[in-house]
Design a protein with these regions (language model features):
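Short, Lys/Arg-enriched anionic-surface-contact patches
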Residues: 1-14, 61-69
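Short, amphipathic alpha-helical "recognition" segments used to contact nucleic acids or chromatin
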Residues: 7-24, 72-81
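Mobile genetic element proteins and their domesticated derivatives, centered on retroelements
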Residues: 15, 29, 40-43, 75, ...
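Acidic/histidine-rich, metal-coordinating catalytic segments
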Residues: 177, 186, 190-211, 233-235, ...
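Mobile-element integrase/transposase regions
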Residues: 69, 100, 105, 111-167, ...
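Basic, flexible linker segments flanking DNA-binding modules
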Residues: 45, 51-147, 216-219, 290-300
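C-terminal, beta-rich DNA-binding module of retroviral/retroelements integrases
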Residues: 278-389
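Charged alpha-helix within mobile-element recombinases
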Residues: 211, 218-305, 346, 351
Length: 389
């Protein structure tokens, strides 16, 4: 798919589609998109009148293409615009356009007859899918493997997918995989789409420490925003199936079809394709509907100031030094993860005799066993045997 620079019209389409979702807070959406409410409501009225973003299954009174030759030309035109799309997606696009499309098998035969079919390398492996019941309960975040650009630099694509709707809330062309880079990109994404309840990530950097520790400064930043960080089981990439599938689609529909010169060029290509993916491309896991049909922005807005963790009166609270990884309790020093240097933590009794937990807000980050001073360390994360897919 040849890319073009994302226009104001593309942003308008996304705004109107999200604003027309049931229960959408339209005034808040105007604020997040940086447009005046009067302008936003005008766009919404035009979108509803034109029907461009309404019920796409509603057919017009007369089909724009009825002849066999015209339908075949339309099938091939869609395929040429989106070379990675198969018969099912093309059939759905014909249906949305109000064209009396032939059977999916006929669409496939049109593609085969016109040399648009490439034999698959092997059969797909069926997997049981799990998903959250509503948008923004879980976002899956990952880096696709880096790609070499025309100027010789590396591009590290950062991908963020809403688990329920498969809506791509973020597709960023990054120069590295550092926590600060991700944090900067997320701030812009949060201001547009709001905050998720949790992120699902793997165990590598920047979500995990290279030394094997679970917590990083980036993760602490998310906790302060009230966002949980869930890690997949080690050596089980299939538990992040939505990310893996998205990465394959990105490779087939962007990298395989475009030679990207540099990072700005890559970001333009990502932005253009992201609009297609969210608003136009039928998704098999969604019954050939588009992700935008199931997504709505979070009601939790990005705060102007980073909230500080609060503790109840009477709790045992300690300040972790900025240069050491210890807090004092009962006359001894107890280790905490390095990521919490300079933060305030609470020490709370656990159900185990003589045991205490060190907490950052509601999250236990380390443990204390007064009967065995040597048995002190970070709390290992309890990962469900059924990780989100």
């Amino acid at each position: 798919m040849p890319f073009q620079e994302v226009s104001i019209m593309d942003e308008r389409r996304e705004f109107v589609r999200l604003a027309m979702q049931e229960g959408a807070n339209r005034r808040e959406l105007c604020r997040r998109f940086g447009i005046h409410p009067d302008t936003g409501y005008k766009w919404i009225d035009r979108g509803a009148f034109d029907g461009e973003l309404g019920d796409r299954s509603r057919r017009p009174h007369s089909s724009p293409a009825r002849t066999e030759r015209a339908i075949e030309d339309r099938v091939l035109a869609i395929r040429d615009e989106h070379p990675a799309w198969g018969a099912r997606k093309i059939w759905r696009c014909l249906d949305w356009a109000g064209i009396e499309a032939p059977a999916i098998s006929t669409v496939h035969e049109i593609l085969r007859r016109n040399d648009r079919i490439v034999a698959p390398a092997g059969g797909a492996v069926a997997r049981v899918r799990f998903e959250k019941p509503a948008p923004n309960l879980l976002w899956q975040m990952d880096f696709k493997g880096w790609v070499r650009l025309g100027d010789g630099r590396r591009c590290h694509p950062l991908t963020i997918i809403d688990d329920h709707s498969r809506y791509d809330v973020g597709l960023e062309a990054c120069a590295d995989e550092q926590g600060n880079t991700v944090q900067t990109r997320l701030q812009l994404i949060f201001r547009r789409y709001g905050l998720p309840q949790a992120f699902f990530v793997d165990n590598g950097a920047p979500w995990g420490d290279s030394s094997g520790q679970r917590w990083t400064r980036f993760g602490v930043w998310l906790l302060k925003l009230g966002i949980d960080v869930l890690h997949s089981r080690p050596y089980h990439p299939q538990s992040r199936g939505k990310n893996e599938r998205f990465h394959r689609t990105l490779k087939a529909e962007v990298f395989a079809l475009n030679r990207l010169r540099d990072l700005p060029h890559a970001q333009q290509a990502f932005d253009t394709w992201r609009e297609v993916y969210n608003l136009e491309r039928p998704h098999e896991a969604l019954g050939q509907q588009v992700p935008a049909s199931r997504y709505r922005p979070s009601t939790r807005s990005m705060p102007d100031r980073l909230p500080q963790v609060e503790y109840d009166d009477g709790e045992i609270v300690r300040a972790v030094p900025t240069s050491k990884d210890y807090v004092s309790f009962k006359g001894r020093l107890w280790k905490v993860p390095q990521a919490f240097r300079g933060e305030r933590v609470a020490i709370r009794p656990l159900s185990v005799d003589g045991g205490y937990g060190i907490f950052f807000g509601a999250h236990q980050i380390a443990k204390i066993n007064l009967t065995d001073p040597e048995c002190v360390g970070d709390v290992s994360e309890q990962v469900s045997a059924m990780s989100p897919n």
